[in-house]
Structure formats: C-alpha cells, structure tokens
A protein has these predicted regions:
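N-terminal alpha-helical targeting/anchoring segments
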Residues: 1-135, 153, 157
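TRNA-recognition modules of translation machinery and tRNA-sensing kinases, especially anticodon-binding
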Residues: 27, 129-424
Length: 424
C-alpha cells in the first residue's frame, strides 16, 4: 500500500496517478486519508502531552508527601486520575483512527509510473514489440478444444462431471505435454539464477493482504470459510509472503525465486466465446517468478524478467507481442506492467500468457519487507513478479499453431521433455 509519507509529500501527484488508473473518487479518498491521519496525529500529540504530565505529577507526589504538603499531593493525585481516565478515551480514539487509516489505505491502488500510458482498458495498451513467425495453417485448421478431442488430450466434459466448468482433465500426451512445459519452464528459470520454491497453495488472510489480492480481489478468490483460508490465484502470494515481516541484509539482494503451483480463480462474470476450452479456467498450472530488490535496481530487474519470458516464447517458436499496459488496464498493485500475448491462428486472436509487473514499494509496505543498508538504515524493498509462464493458453497456442495434416508438431526445445516429436 502507499505510505503516508508518499501521500503527504506528493499529494497532487498521487491523485493524478490514481486518476490515471481510473480510481473512483481519488481526490476525495486522499483528502479523507489526510484528514484521518491528522486526527490520529493530533490525538497522539494530546495523549503524549497527558502522559508526560502524568509522569511529572507522579514523581512530584512522593516529594510533596515527604515535605508534608498533603493537600497539594492529593490535588496531584486527583489530576493524575483525571488524566488517566482521559487517556483511556484518547487511546481508544487514536486506535480507531489508526484502524480507519489502515482500512482506507488498503482500498487505494498503487500509483502508476510516469511511463504508463493513459487509457481506460485493453484497447489503449501500447504494443512495444512483436516477435516470432506467423504460422501458416491448413485451411481446415481447428481450435484447440477440437484438437484436444480429436487426439484425446483434454476432456472438458469429464472435468464438468467431476467438478464443474473450468476444471479440465488432461489425458495421455496432453498430460505429458503439460508436465513437460512445467519442467521446461522451471529448468529455464533455474538456468537464469532463480531458486525453486514449492509453497502451499492455500494461504491465510494476512498473506492475501500482504500482496494486495485482499481486499481488492476477495470475490475472485476461493475462500474456505470454515478455516478462513484462501486458495491461491498465483504463486506470487505465498512466495512473496515468505518475506513478510522480514528485514533482509543488503547483501542478500536481489532475491530470485520461482515456483510451480496450481492456481485457482473464480473468474466470476466471465462468459462468451473468449472462455471456450483453455482460454479461461478456474484451475490451472503456472510457473511464477518473484524478485525482491533494492529500489535503484528494480528497473533493471524488471527488464531481465521481460527478457526471460520473451526467451521462453522464442524457444517455443510462438508468435508473440509485448504490451505496455495503460493505467486503466493495470492491476490494483502494479506500478508498471507488461503483458505477453501469443497469437492463435486458429482462433484469430491474441491470448495473454504472462504479466510481468514492478510493484515498487507497494507490496513491501504491506508486507513490511525491508532491507538494512551498509549504513544501518532500514528501507523498503521493491517487489516484482511475472508468469513464466501460465500453461493453459500456451498449450492452446502450441496445439493450434503446430497442427499439420499429420498431427501436432512439438517444438524442438520441448522434445527432450515430452519424449515425442508429434501428437498423432
């Protein structure tokens, strides 16, 4: 979340940034934050003054008694009692103001960087780069859900029977392809210096608040009400929360972690042709990169992550493009985000397969993730993460873009992992 110092020192810039994200009532909300913070500070000032007076009077009472000034001592005792009673009310008032302030800050998104373009939604995102070769498919090319049925790779109906829509069952070479991609992505991450983590896929509320999924995405997360736990929408949540309430040594940075997990998203309100097959699922596999770094290095770290994801798509021989997201299309927590999309020749549309984001200090402030400098100062870290990669749409694109009259060709980079060159 934003720090009070950010808001008080750069009030106008913060409001402009929130308006770029199309955050409703930005000015009014920030004014409410400042008012609540002033109330908390003013109450604290009065409380501190009262506590100082109580300490002073308490010390004087003993001296007055020794000097035989019983009336003055009694007056001092009565004043101490009055102040203590008043301080109880002041403490409650200050605690309430602090709670109100914290709850307000939780509802405010991160401020986008100046390099983030203006815009309302996906149509305003800026194409930064395009790569890969366009695929020439047979005239009777099929979308992946029909290919999955033809080659008995994925059973969507069986998933509906077992669980419901959005929970496919992978079979045979479909399951092998899924596992091959996971291992390929993890191996590539390790080659790039990432440490593999195997985290829980269920987290508590504090973890959800730490990375910003709560309260913003509460309705999109599966909630186990009996135990008050949440199924993770991304490995970002448990992996980043490893460093909640941690002060790192400067020499430990950067931290580079990767994790493969199942991810769970309710995707409430998603209907229509864009959700067919693997395009939008409630449960899916994903490999995530998480980095923690010093502020002065996070721009370089972000670029390294972008290069890593681009390298994966190149090795998979997929046509792709990189988008710089506009303010209105960015996530609640991101300060800067790039999306990677692969082109589906069979569906004639672009499919998002990765988002790579820099969160500046926004998550770190929530998490209290800090580092100690050589000068013994404690500073907030920068956190970054990105999908490398999300599997469903990658599988969809691989099936569709590599279909031939003989079957589905496997990219060379994956053959050592699949053990086969063709699905037929």
């Amino acid at each position: 979340m934003l720090t009070i110092k950010q808001i008080t020192d750069n009030t106008d810039a913060v409001i402009r940034g929130l308006e770029k994200k199309h955050f409703k009532n930005a000015k009014e909300t920030i004014e409410q934050v400042l008012e609540t913070n002033n109330k908390r500070r003013n109450t604290q000032t009065i409380l501190d003054k009262n506590l100082s007076e109580v300490n002073s009077l308490s010390k004087s009472i003993g001296m007055l008694m020794k000097e035989g000034k019983k009336d003055e001592a009694e007056t001092a005792k009565n004043r101490v009692a009055e102040l203590k009673e008043a301080n109880k009310a002041l403490q409650e008032e200050m605690d309430q103001a602090a709670t109100d302030l914290q709850n307000l800050l939780y509802t405010i998104p991160n401020v986008p960087y100046d390099s983030v373009p203006e815009g309302v939604g996906a149509g305003d995102n800026v194409v930064e780069k395009m790569g890969g070769m366009e695929t020439e498919l047979p005239k009777d090319a099929l979308p992946h859900w029909e290919l999955a049925k033809k080659y008995d790779l994925i059973d969507f109906d069986l998933g509906v029977k077992i669980t419901g829509a959005g929970f496919p069952v992978y079979k045979g070479k479909g399951a092998q392809l899924q596992r091959a991609l996971i291992n390929f992505f993890l191996d590539e991450a390790r080659k790039s210096g990432y440490t593999e983590i195997m985290p829980p896929t269920v987290v508590n509320g504090a973890s959800g608040y730490g990375t910003g999924q709560l309260p913003d995405k509460e309705g999109q997360m599966y909630h186990c009400e009996v135990d008050d736990l949440y199924l993770i929408p991304t490995a970002e949540v448990p992996v980043t929360n490893i460093y909640r309430d941690v002060i790192l040594d400067e020499k430990q940075l950067p931290i580079k972690n990767c994790a493969y997990t199942q991810c769970f998203r309710r995707e409430a309100g998603s209907y229509g042709k864009d959700v067919r097959g693997l395009n939008r699922l409630h449960e899916f596999s994903k490999v995530e990169l998480v980095r923690i770094d010093k502020p002065e290095h996070s721009k370089e770290s972000h670029q390294e992550m972008l290069d890593h994801v681009e390298g994966l798509l190149q090795k998979l021989e997929l046509p792709y493009r990189i988008l710089r997201l506009c303010g209105g299309d960015m996530s609640f927590t991101a300060a800067l985000c790039f999306d990677f999309e692969v082109y589906s020749e069979a569906q004639k549309r672009w499919l998002e397969v990765s988002s790579v984001s820099n969160f500046d200090t926004y998550q770190a402030n929530r998490l209290k993730c800090r580092y100690r400098t050589a000068e013994k100062k404690t500073e907030l870290c920068h956190t970054l993460n990105g999908s490398a990669l999300a599997l469903p749409r990658i599988v969809a694109a691989l099936l569709e873009n590599n279909q031939t009259p003989e079957g589905i060709r496997i990219p060379k980079a994956l053959v050592p992992y699949t053990g086969f060159e063709m699905i037929d």
